[in-house]
UniProtKB/Swiss-Prot annotation:
Gene Ontology CC: one annotated term: cytoplasm
Keywords associated with the record: Acyltransferase, Amino-acid biosynthesis, Arginine biosynthesis, Autocatalytic cleavage, Cytoplasm, Multifunctional enzyme, Transferase
Entry's family note: Belongs to the ArgJ family.
Annotated substrate binding sites: T156, K182, T193, E279, N403, S408
Gene responsible for this protein: argJ
Example GO molecular function: L-glutamate N-acetyltransferase activity
Subunit structure, interactors included: Heterotetramer of two alpha and two beta chains.
Keyword Repeat assigned: no
Protein name, as recorded: Arginine biosynthesis bifunctional protein ArgJ
Stored InterPro entries: Arg_biosynth_ArgJ, ArgJ-like_dom_sf, ArgJ_beta_C
Positions bearing the site annotation: Involved in the stabilization of negative charge on the oxyanion by the formation of the oxyanion hole: T119, G120
Reaction(s) catalysed (UniProt annotation): N(2)-acetyl-L-ornithine + L-glutamate = N-acetyl-L-glutamate + L-ornithine; L-glutamate + acetyl-CoA = N-acetyl-L-glutamate + CoA + H(+)
PANTHER family listed in its UniProt record: ARGININE BIOSYNTHESIS BIFUNCTIONAL PROTEIN ARGJ, ARGININE BIOSYNTHESIS BIFUNCTIONAL PROTEIN ARGJ, MITOCHONDRIAL
GO biological process: L-arginine biosynthetic process; ornithine biosynthetic process
Length: 408
């Protein structure tokens, strides 16, 4: 059950000049399900990517990194769902390369100018016969307004498509930003998102785009977690087609800050949508750590709380057993933490002060907050002035059911 997940209507999704998308049913995931997506990018488009830090990197991730490292143009992307092409060794690597070659022939572009992406079951061979047979239909479907279909086409256990679209004024010009993401489980990206594609018709110089992709991932997709698992296939792609008549060459350009902020807002929304649609989620939780000595320790504490199964199940049950939060803070890895300076709020309710229970705290007040669909947990460490935030969800019975039945 998605938690307050707002999806724009198809008519509200804005095409990005220079991007065409086609979707097809290849039978990789399930019969009658769109599971193959192709992006075609106009000449002159700039592309940058950020990928999983999992050492068990999927074959398509390796191919993407190799193609981007060549420094040439990227003219197309191809995404399949239902199979991750991970844990497949040399044959899987060849399949990812062959996918690029097959699409390249259809689009008349070199294979090294294509980026492949896969998501789904790990340790299973990619069904190349079905994938390559589906490519012509995806290419035939290419159109500027293909974002809505693509958002559906990249889904796995997602219950709803995740789309963001907006227009902003940059340097007196109208700039369009549209993106999609997918993911509902195995989400602690530590780099980007499960799969995320964000495009703008502004022009951004390639070196700046690479740095911007890293920054956007860090403030958005690197701040979410569902279950603490980092996927083998996580990929975030940032595309700038340069069709809007606005070009940013350096971070010092007057237009850069406004464009960066608009892209960051889009990326953050796409990241939060993943948590709102997390497998079995009934609560959307914001874990904010304040008064930390640095960002690293703020995130250590936030993730310790966000990853704790005991904390997550307590929120599912609306059970104010909040000592579980204190325990998670204690094992977060800050060796010199002075717990006597710690304060904890649940929404507007002060639960703990000076490392112990607030004398005025009433459990009924805590439970009132925990029954809400969206919950803010604030933790003040009393160590400094740095703050950071992580977004997560509860663990429900449905999470276990979804993952137990995933391959059945």
């Amino acid at each position: 059950m998605a938690v307050n997940l707002q999806i724009p209507s198809e008519s509200e999704i804005l095409p990005v000049a220079g991007v065409e998308i086609g979707v097809a049913e290849a039978g990789i995931r399930k019969a009658g399900r769109r599971d193959l997506t192709v992006f075609r990018l106009a000449p002159g488009s700039a592309v940058a990517g950020v990928f999983t830090r999992n050492r068990f990197r999927a074959a398509p991730v390796q191919v993407c990194e190799a193609h981007l490292a060549q420094g040439g143009p990227i003219r197309a992307l191809v995404v399949n769902t239902g199979n991750a092409n991970a844990g497949t060794g040399a044959p899987g690597l060849k399949n990812a390369q062959d996918t690029c070659a097959a699409l390249g022939k259809l689009l008349d572009v070199p294979a090294e100018q294509i980026l492949p992406f896969s998501t789904g079951v790990i340790l299973e061979p990619l069904p190349m016969d079905r994938l390559t047979a589906g490519l012509p239909a995806a290419v035939a479907d290419l159109r500027a307004d293909g974002w809505y279909g693509a958002a559906h086409g990249i889904m796995t256990t997602d219950t709803l498509p995740k789309i963001h679209s907006r227009r902003v004024n940059i340097g007196g010009k109208t700039v369009t930003i549209t993106g999609i993401s997918k993911g509902a489980g195995m989400i602690r990206p530590n780099m980007a998102t499960m799969l995320g594609f964000l495009a703008t018709d502004a022009g951004i110089a390639q070196p700046l785009l690479r740095q911007l992709a890293i920054e956007l991932a860090d403030v958005s997709f690197n701040r979410i977690t569902v279950d603490g698992d980092t996927s083998t296939n996580d990929s975030f792609i940032l595309i700038a087609t340069g069709q809007a008549g606005v070009t940013v060459d350096s971070a010092g350009d007057a237009a850069y800050a406004a464009l960066r902020d608009a892209l960051a807002a889009a990326a953050t929304d796409l990241a939060q949508k993943i948590v709102r649609d997390a497998e079995g989620a009934t609560k959307f939780m914001t874990i904010r750590v304040e008064e930390a000595g640095n960002t690293e320790e703020a995130l250590k504490v936030a993730y310790a709380v966000a990853h704790s199964p005991l904390v997550k199940t307590a929120f599912f049950a609306s059970d104010p057993n909040l000592g579980r939060i204190l325990a998670a803070i204690g094992y977060a890895g800050i060796d010199d933490l002075d717990v006597s300076r710690l304060r904890l709020w649940l929404g507007d309710v002060l639960v703990a002060v000076d490392g112990g229970r607030n004398p005025d705290y009433q459990e009924a007040d805590g439970q009132r907050v925990m029954k809400q669909a969206e919950i803010l947990v604030r933790i003040a460490l009393g160590r400094g002035q740095v703050a950071d935030t992580v977004y997560t969800c509860d663990f429900s019975h449905e999470y276990v059911t979804i993952n137990a039945d995933y391959r059945s």
